[in-house]
Structures are given as C-alpha cells and as structure tokens.
Amino acid sequence: MNRLTKRGLKEKSMTLKILWLIIHTIFLYIAYTICFDDLVIWVDEIFDIDYSKGNIYRKYCLISFGVFMYLRMNLTGLYLLKRKIPIDEFFGVTTAFAAYQIGFVLLGAWQPESLNILDVFGVLLFIIGSYFNTYSEIQRNRFKNDPNNKGKLYTQGLFKYAKHINYFGDVCWVTGWAIITHNLWAGIVPIMLTL
C-alpha cells in the first residue's frame, strides 16, 4: 500500500501490520484463557499440569507483561516502523509473539511458588529492557522525521551508548519475562534471541 507522507512516498505494508495486531490479540487471549479460565482443561490434560494451582500473582505478571508488550509492539508496528515488512520478518515476529505470549504462560502459569526477589529482578529487567527498546526507537523516529537528517545515521540519545541499544533492550525484557516463569526451559528464548 503506497501512501504520501511528510517524508515522501512510503510503502507501509499496513496489511501485515494489522494482521500482526490481530494475531497478537489472539495470542494474548489464549494466554489469558490458559491462566484464568477453568474451562480450558484440555491444556492441563495435554501437559499433565494443573494450571489452576499456579500462583495468581505470577499469572498476573505474565499477563501484564503480555498486555504491556502488546501495547509497545503495536506502537512500534503502527507508528514507529516506517518501512515495509518483509514476509519472512512477519513470520519471525509472529513466532516470537507466540513464544512470549503463549510459551511463557505455558511454562510459568502453573508454578505455585510465591513471588520472590528473583521475580522482582525479572520485573525490573522487563521494565528496563522495555525502556531501552521503545524509548530508543522513539528518539530515532524523531530524528528521522526531521528532513535535515535525511541519509544520516542516528548516533544520539540512547544510541550513543550502543549501535543496537534497542536490541539490548529486547534481550533484557525477554530475559525478565523468562525469569518470571520460574522455569529453566524459558531461558532458551532469550538465548535464541541473542543468536
């Protein structure tokens, strides 16, 4: 889809961005249902795990992270991401959404342990990572929207600390989310993200 913007003619691939939003909404709904709907006994039966015995506050954290990520990623996809989304990136991001939204819930929502200092660390890491990722993108977006900066590389703001500070933020918030699950298998996700 072509659209005239202040910066000229831009291909937005709005269809894929809206499809991201819809799929991400479905993932969030599935995660919520696994955490809080007693009617979803098929998940318990498949994994032979009783999700109803999971710590309620851990479930709230897992779902809250999902909602926060949903809002952040839609801000990024619909507002900050100006370029066309290639189809392979669409499928890669969709797979990542499934791992975060549904995978972390499947791994952590059944854990009965009370929240502890490790969870506080996970929450802080999630918040700090979200800040580095999103705020750095907002700063770069402001820079790119200035016609005087056309063709220039952005090395100010948070990007003055690292070339890919936004990706550092990704690794932090995903690691924080994995920590909240209290499941070592969740550690595979941030490891895969760094490769």
Residue ranges with predicted function:
Residues T76-I128, T134:
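Hydrophobic transmembrane alpha-helical segments that form the core helix bundle
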